[in-house]
Amino acid sequence: QWLTRNSEMSKFEGVVWNNVLVGCGSNVKGVEKGWPYAANTVVEKTPEEVEKPFLTVNDGKYSVFVPKVKNNTVGVSWSGDKVDGEFIDLDKFYVAKPGDSVAKINSQLNAGKNLILTPGIYSLDAPIEIKNEDTIVLGLGYATLKPTNGNECMKVADVGGVSIAGVLFDAGQVNSSTLLTVGTAGNKTSHKDNPITLCDTFYRVGGADETPGKATTCVIINSSDVIGDNFWVWRADHGKGVAWTKNTADHGVIINGDNVTTYGLMVEHFQKYQTMWNGNGGKCYMYQSELPYDIPNQSSWNASGSYGYTDYKVAGNVTSHE
């Protein structure tokens, strides 16, 4: 259950479960044998490489570097003298802190600012709304968004170039229909030339405190051409406030957009389908999942016309999926 992406190495050994190498070339020793002879999958080139934005300082001046999305890559992206991307001055960002109101954050976003979420827990009585193209949202230190009124944590309009990175979406006590929604249902606008990217995003339902979290679905992706890198989507199976009827959550991920690509999609313990993929042209490089452990009886866990739920469900009308 391991993904290595865009790395350079001479040898990889010690594989037990599924081991996936993407964009690491074809000459890595130790992974020559693939399935079904060994638990290795090697994809020589990364079809669409996205790296998360990061905070940097040059000559005492802070900025955020936003790497450019690149196609068909092998190896690390930073080996040369010049790395493709853009430096954005810190004055183009609103630097938020826990306790800031949603109204204040949204006002800054509507004015054209990007957003840095400093470490801490943000209690939200309404969703943070991303409406402008090319908006950067960068969380530091596992910045955590937690709804208080059964609202979403964040809504992203169907606009290109948005980047969400380093954010934990944590379900609140009142059930939320979703924690993150990307795009609007039914919209088929292509963003191939300027995709929305989701890097190092984490979704949690319960487990952190005695107040059980609740969410129907953690993340719904309606936009097309979205690239996701490192999703951890978890209905708690241990910790505090955990039980079948306490931290309730039907689904981890629902993907309705076309041509969505994920690298490292990990979804665990939801009470119906873990992942539902309804869009065409989807690609998933390394999937890890666990079904719920706490099912009380068969009648509590039956899909229509069958016993139990498929873990990774691709809709019947989908004609292409990898």
PLM features: residue spans?
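Extracellular/periplasmic carbohydrate-active domains that bind, remodel
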Residues: 1-322
